[in-house]
A protein has these predicted regions:
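Local sequence-structure signature of Cys/Sec-based thiol-disulfide redox active-site neighborhoods
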Residues: 1-23, 27
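ATP/adenylate-binding site constellation spanning eukaryotic-like Ser/Thr protein kinases
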Residues: 8, 38, 50
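Short alpha-helical
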Residues: 12-13, 40, 72
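Generic recognition of short, well-ordered alpha-helical segments
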Residues: 15-19, 47-48, 68
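Non-catalytic, surface beta->alpha helical segment in thiol-disulfide oxidoreductase systems
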Residues: 58-82
């Protein structure tokens, strides 16, 4: 399982989203986690079709834009990992 978090350096809420995801993923070390600057990866942003950050992509599919709900993200991780 791979989680990508797209952010922009000037985004005021991105640090909160990063912190939430990283804290949750401490319980799931088998999950690959990558943070990507949306400006530097505009091809992926266009491909995935989002226009705001933070954006969370799980296994190549856009899952959420904005600060994620911790319980919903945990449920998604558990459901994906099986």
């Amino acid at each position: 399982m791979k989680i990508e978090l797209f952010y922009n350096p000037g985004c005021p809420i991105c640090p909160k989203a990063k912190k939430l995801v990283k804290k949750l993923l401490r319980k799931y070390p088998q999950v690959e986690y990558v943070e990507l600057n949306a400006f530097e990866h505009q091809d992926r942003v266009i491909q995935l079709g989002f226009q705001a950050v933070p954006a969370i992509v799980i296994d190549g599919a856009l899952w959420h834009v904005g600060i994620p709900d911790k319980k919903a993200l945990k449920k998604k991780i558990i459901g994906t990992l099986g």
